């Protein structure tokens, strides 16, 4: 299944291939939030040179989330082994929500602690990642590809997540 997240930022567009076959729960969560417009207008609230850029906090502080948490998904062949890896930011095991990060280079110390669920598609996408600074914005995020099968397989999770989202963000 070929799915691409397209993150339009104030610095340019980042195209990310999602690893939905290996991380279906994480990808379904990300896609669901994207389809609801959750990420649109959010900032990159944490940027560390030569390490990563992080966004997806509705408060812009790194302390917020969608109103629910879900478990990690680890795969032996998905590692933080290069620049451009998309992962879930978390506060420990089973605390994934909406915050994501994209690496500037290999970060092997994060393996087994953060779910890898995508990677930038090209050097030009990575150039945009490298140009992002704290406070830069995700203007609009959308998905390219057929999400129907993936989302149908995660319907029970989606129902739970969307109930929590409706409570926390009634305008989504």
Residue ranges and their predicted role:
Residues 1-172:
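Cyclophilin-like peptidyl-prolyl cis-trans isomerases
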């Amino acid at each position: 299944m070929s799915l691409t997240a397209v993150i339009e930022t104030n610095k340019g567009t980042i195209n990310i291939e999602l690893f939905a076959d290996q991380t279906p729960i994480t990808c379904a969560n990300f896609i669901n939030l994207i389809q609801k417009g959750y990420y649109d207008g959010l900032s990159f609230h944490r940027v560390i040179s030569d390490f990563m850029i992080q966004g997806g906090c509705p408060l812009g502080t790194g302390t917020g989330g969608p109103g629910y948490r879900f478990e990690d998904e680890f795969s032996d062949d998905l590692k933080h082994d290069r620049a451009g890896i998309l992962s879930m930011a978390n506060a420990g095991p089973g605390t994934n929500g909406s915050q994501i990060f994209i690496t500037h280079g290999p970060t092997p110390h994060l393996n087994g602690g953060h779910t890898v669920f995508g990677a930038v598609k090209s050097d030009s996408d990575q150039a945009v990642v490298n140009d992002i600074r704290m406070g830069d914005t995700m203007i609009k995020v959308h998905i390219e590809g057929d999400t129907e099968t993936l989302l149908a397989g995660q319907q029970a999770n989606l129902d739970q997540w969307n109930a929590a989202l409706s409570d926390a963000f009634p305008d989504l």
